[in-house]
Amino acid sequence: MQLNDLRSAPGARREKHRPGRGIGSGLGKTGGRGHKGLTSRSGGKVAPGFEGGQQPLHRRLPKFGFVSLKAMDRAEVRTSELAKVEGDVVSLQTLKDANLINQHVQRVKVMLSGEVGRAVTLKGIAATKGARAAIEAAGGKFED
């Protein structure tokens, strides 16, 4: 027996449906679409979310929330990520150069998460109380 001699057992695989190929197939003439109506036509399908004229769910439910524009230009940085910045001074530009924040970010806040590996000077960057204490304990300082 060779690989090219292998065959599925008889009855193991069903033949695919071929709509519109004779009445003996069970899907002849109308091809399983029924008679007339929207879904019998080519391209005939209702839009997603359409509920037959009933007010759709997305219009029955109330609006809620909003997108804060402040979130667009603010970012958070962990204390453990400060080690990725080259040099001893950490500023907005050095964080962007290290790919820790996006280019459009204008304000950054340092959060306490992980170890502060070395003494760094933070210029124009805010920090939480815990992060500030950890950075100062490692010999770092803050400048405005």
UniProtKB/Swiss-Prot annotation:
Task: Please give the Gene3D superfamilies that the UniProt record associates with this protein.
Answer: 3.100.10.10
Entry keyword Glycoprotein: no
- Name the domain of life this protein comes from: Bacteria
The record, for InterPro entries, names:
Ribosomal_uL15 (IPR030878), Ribosomal_uL15/eL18 (IPR021131), Ribosomal_uL15/eL18_sf (IPR036227), Ribosomal_uL15_bac-type (IPR005749), Ribosomal_uL15_CS (IPR001196)
Which molecular-function annotation in GO is an example for this chain?
Answer: rRNA binding
Record keywords: Ribonucleoprotein, Ribosomal protein, RNA-binding, rRNA-binding
Tell me which stretches of the chain form a coiled coil.
Answer: none
Q: Name one GO cellular component term.
A: cytosolic large ribosomal subunit
Biological process GO annotation list?
Answer: translation
An example of a Pfam family matching this protein is Ribosomal_L27A
Q: What are the start and end residues of every segment in region (Disordered)?
A: 1-57
Q: Where is the composition biased (Gly residues)?
A: 21-31
User: Belongs to which family?
Assistant: Belongs to the universal ribosomal protein uL15 family.
Q: How does it assemble?
A: Part of the 50S ribosomal subunit.
Q: What does this protein do?
A: Binds to the 23S rRNA.
Question: What is the official name of this protein in its record?
Answer: Large ribosomal subunit protein uL15
State the organism named in the record.
Pseudomonas aeruginosa (strain ATCC 15692 / DSM 22644 / CIP 104116 / JCM 14847 / LMG 12228 / 1C / PRS 101 / PAO1)
